[in-house]
């Protein structure tokens, strides 16, 4: 099997084990196309993986993720692993995890929900992680994966 050759990053974050085809969505929801620090963003798509068969990898130079950003990744790519890189070495590694309660990172798909009209933080309860299903705290609308991804 051919070896994947991608340059190492000195400081930043590597998001690994993203399901194949979801890497662009990860870049989009994190707003990595508008990085202000001048750091590179690298996307490797459809890379061979022992765990997933095929996977995507995102490398972000000079950026470390917030808890909110990690939670967003979990909604798009629940199998992802986040690696924190300092001085070219992995100093921290963890799997993303879908939280039981999601606040402030997802919009309700119900156009009549109070979250669209009042100054309240959208809040959802995770009903199921596989397949992903959430319920709005305010209007009780249930959303499944496709609608969740459209409302991130």
From Swiss-Prot:
Keyword terms, alphabetized: Metal-binding, Pyrimidine biosynthesis, Zinc
Ribonucleoprotein recorded as keyword: no
Positions that bind Zn(2+): 108, 113, 136, 139
Annotated GO CC locations: aspartate carbamoyltransferase complex
InterPro entries given in the database record: Asp_carbamoyltransf_reg_N (IPR020545), Asp_carbamoylTrfase_reg (IPR002801), Asp_carbamoyltrfase_reg_C (IPR020542), Asp_carbatrfase_reg_C_sf (IPR036792), Asp_carbatrfase_reg_N_sf (IPR036793)
Cofactor needs: Zn(2+)
Co-factor binding details: Binds 1 zinc ion per subunit.
GO BP term, example: 'de novo' pyrimidine nucleobase biosynthetic process
UniProt GO molecular function: metal ion binding
Pfam families recorded: PyrI, PyrI_C
Subunit structure and binding partners: Contains catalytic and regulatory chains.
Function: Involved in allosteric regulation of aspartate carbamoyltransferase.
Family according to the record: Belongs to the PyrI family.
Name of the protein in its database record: Aspartate carbamoyltransferase regulatory chain
Biological classification of the source: Archaea, Methanobacteriati, Methanobacteriota, Thermococci, Thermococcales
